[in-house]
Design a protein with these regions (language model features):
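N-terminal, positively charged, Ser/Thr/Ala/Gly-biased leader segments
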Residues: 1-26
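Acidic active-site catalytic centers that drive phospho-/nucleotidyl reactions
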Residues: 17, 140, 162
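Feature captures the catalytic cores and cofactor-binding loops of soluble hydro-lyases/lyases
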Residues: 25, 31-141
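Short polybasic amphipathic segments
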Residues: 143-149
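Conserved small/polar residues in nucleotide/adenosyl-binding loops
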Residues: 155-162
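Hydrophobic alpha-helical segments, chiefly the membrane-spanning helices
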Residues: 166-172
Length: 172
């Protein structure tokens, strides 16, 4: 995963709660051990419906190539399936914004250079609105800010202990 100090991308809105790691990376692909190429299996049941083309948010303009994903609460719950994070990073996702994450998924994000950011309440609604309107969002690690056209929010980065124990870039 490429490190960054700032990231600007249109954020893809996935306004759904309780997305577990089996939805992100289905169990039938668990025997694939090479991290490269796992992105094609991310959200497989939702992206590969058998119909020509997919209407899944990450497959539709203007969200094709989004590096930021804004999701509902409890994203990444369920098993300790690290392949879910590998699939997301291989798909090009570099930051996930949600009200909450599964604990093991959160740790796996930190260990694999995928930035998880938690926002709740009105702040979360502003970020989701920006994503729904396909506004570019900028994440700045040095200032710990998220900005879009009409918002500037401070976020709490992973703790220094979490950064030391992971491969997340530090803001220094």
């Amino acid at each position: 995963m490429r490190k960054f100090t700032t990231l600007t991308s249109i954020a893809a809105p996935l306004n759904e709660t309780n997305i577990d790691t089996d939805i992100i990376f289905p169990a039938r692909f668990l025997l694939i051990m090479d991290k490269l190429g796992l992105g094609k299996y991310a959200f497989n049941e939702r992206r590969n419906t058998g119909i020509k083309g997919s209407n899944f948010v990450l497959d539709t303009p203007p969200y094709l190539g989004s590096e930021i994903l804004v999701t509902g609460a409890r994203f990444g719950i369920g098993s300790s399936r690290e392949q879910a994070v590998w699939a997301l990073t291989d798909l090009g996702i570099r930051c996930i914004i949600a009200p909450s994450f599964g604990d093991i998924f959160y740790a796996n994000c930190l260990n694999n250079g995928l930035l998880p950011i938690e926002f709740n309440g009105a702040e979360y609604q502003l970020v989701m609105q920006a994503a729904n309107e396909a506004e570019p969002i900028t994440i700045d690690l040095a200032t710990q800010t998220l900005t879009a056209s009409n918002i500037c929010l401070l976020y709490t980065s992973p703790s220094p202990r979490d950064k030391r124990q992971s491969r997340m870039p530090s803001s220094a």
